[in-house]
Amino acid sequence: MKTLLLTLVVVTIVCLDLGYTRICFNHQSSQPQTTKTCSPGESSCYHKQWSDFRGTIIERGCGCPTVKPGIKLSCCESEVCNN
């Protein structure tokens, strides 16, 4: 009985995949495509876009930040969804 219970606990932990982390793109507008493994607890990715004297700037990363007016923000919750 103890063996069955222990086996059930191990299977549950493996199936739940405790400690799962999100992977997001984190490159800037003109940079080569790169990804980042997000910190535990960060379950979303963001794509932030604005314009200034340099032209259109795009920033990507983990989380879903608060932005100022005039900045376009898209947040998503799947792997590398912020391209």
UniProtKB/Swiss-Prot annotation:
Region ranges (Loop I): 24-38
Residue span of region Loop III: 64-75
Signal sequence segment: 1-21
PROSITE patterns for this protein: SNAKE_TOXIN
Stretch between loop I and loop II: annotated span: 39-44
InterPro entries found in the cross-reference section: Snake_3FTx (IPR003571), Snake_toxin-like_sf (IPR045860), Snake_toxin_con_site (IPR018354), Toxin_cobra-type (IPR054131)
Highest taxon, organism lineage: Eukaryota
Localization per Swiss-Prot or TrEMBL: Secreted
GO molecular function per UniProt: acetylcholine receptor inhibitor activity; ion channel regulator activity; toxin activity
Cellular component annotations (GO), alphabetically ordered: extracellular region
Site (Key residue for binding to acetylcholine receptor): 29, 31, 48, 54
CDD domains from the UniProt entry: TFP_snake_toxin
Site (Moderately important residue for binding to acetylcholine receptor) location in chain: 27, 30, 46, 53, 55
Annotated tissue distribution: Expressed by the venom gland.
Keyword flag Secreted: yes
Keywords: Acetylcholine receptor inhibiting toxin, Disulfide bond, Ion channel impairing toxin, Neurotoxin, Postsynaptic neurotoxin, Secreted, Signal, Toxin
Disulfide bridge map: 24-45, 38-62, 64-75, 76-81
Site residues by UniProt (Very important residue for binding to acetylcholine receptor): 28, 50, 52, 57, 59, 68
Region (Loop II): 45-62
Family to which the UniProt record says this protein belongs: Belongs to the three-finger toxin family. Short-chain subfamily. Type I alpha-neurotoxin sub-subfamily.
Function: Binds with high affinity to muscular nicotinic acetylcholine receptors (nAChRs) (tested on Torpedo marmorata, Kd=0.07 nM), and with low affinity to neuronal alpha-7/CHRNA7 nAChRs (tested on chimeric alpha-7/CHRNA7, Kd=22 uM) and inhibit acetylcholine from binding to the receptor, thereby impairing neuromuscular transmission. Produces peripheral paralysis by blocking neuromuscular transmission at the postsynaptic site.
Protein name: Erabutoxin b
